[in-house]
Amino acid sequence: MSAKRIVSLVPSITELLVDLGLETAIVGVTKFCVHPKHLRKNTTIIGGTKNLRLEVIRQLQPDLILANKEENVREQVEALAAEFKVYTSDIGNFDEALSMIKTVGELTDRLPEAEALITQINQAKSRFEAVKPNNSKHYRTLYLIWQKPWMSVGGDTYISNMM
């Protein structure tokens, strides 16, 4: 059964839903889901990734909520999972990101679109690897992902693994 009312608790997943052609099914997003810009005009803002407005989400009566282990607060996601269908992604590397895309495609009856996107991503990765020098140096890098407060990538994270 295709999801008709989706709440996305993660900006990157919101963008994925749009890429899969599900823009009209999205009924709720976080205040950090800023792409595509026009999406916020037609959806309900359900708080931030760490401070969800659970009552607003309940009023939306979603048939699917998409969350992420690192982005969202476990207790809030568990409270929603007691009432609604919730998928929580846990992405630490490239292959897990592709697996999440496929899973979201399956959950939303958009598997062909998800598989096409995975193919595009793999092709882009192959093109990048073809031009990357074999003796590429590894540089220490400070990648700031947020300010107020300042936060950077570190440790065993998806972004760190991709870099």
What residues fall within each predicted segment?
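N-terminal ligand-binding lobe of clamshell/alpha-beta domains
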Residues: 1-163
